Amino acid sequence: MSLLTEVETYVLSIVPSGPLKAEIAQRLEDVFAGKNTDLEALMEWLKTRPILSPLTKGILGFVFTLTCPSERGLQRRRFVQNALNGNGDPNNMDKAVKLYRKLKREITFHGAKEVALSYSAGALASCMGLIYNRMGTVTTEVAFGLVCATCEQIADSQHRSHRQMVTTTNPLIRHENRMVLASTTAKAMEQMAGSSEQAAEAMEVASQARQMVQAMRTIGTHPSSSAGLKDDLLENLQAYQKRMGVQMQRFK
């Protein structure tokens, strides 16, 4: 796996799924391929994105700044600085300085990532802030190692909370989760369908599913009534894809 592929993988792992994630993935690919070099426009776009947490925006801003060639005097952005200040905790700042000294001695991506993984996400973000504010310099490879370690720490905690939700025995939460997943699957089907004639059937299935979810929410139903709803939808989607000759593993 190339270095930039690895960076893209880690960064996208902390972005919530949805149309915005696809948009960010495209921006990252363009930046890494050297197709998008307008850092100012990129940062303006990032700043106004909804849904993303300030820390995720800060990390993305840091990655864009590392990758885009920019004029020496280009202003640092306040929204990135605020996100990478370790919540203003002096403890985080002390640890960030210690980590920075260790990173100065590293020259490889994996070496830097290994060193950084023993620190908390707050200290890692503060260390990124030091580098972003030009208070310290490390090689781009080492900075990317720091980015990936931070994303891994965040993704780990997100995974724990996601697993808690998936394994919850509370029938109401499970029911709502199935309906939300059915809705998002239906939305994805509608987006994929496009304007081809064969798409009418997929649109119909998706539309029915969304109406069913709406009705269930409006009248209130037994928590087990949504079981199988998403699976039925996915079966329909995969059957439609086969006829269209499309194979999208991502939905499985």
Swiss-Prot record:
GO biological process assignments: viral budding from plasma membrane
Keyword Membrane: yes
Pfam families, sorted: Flu_M1, Flu_M1_C
Residue ranges, annotated region (Membrane-binding): 1-164
Motif (Nuclear localization signal): 101-105
Miscellaneous comment in the UniProt entry for this protein: Most abundant protein in virion. When expressed alone can form virus-like particles in transfected cells.
Protein's UniProt name: Matrix protein 1
Source organism per UniProt: Influenza A virus (strain A/Swine/Wisconsin/1/1961 H1N1)
Gene field: M
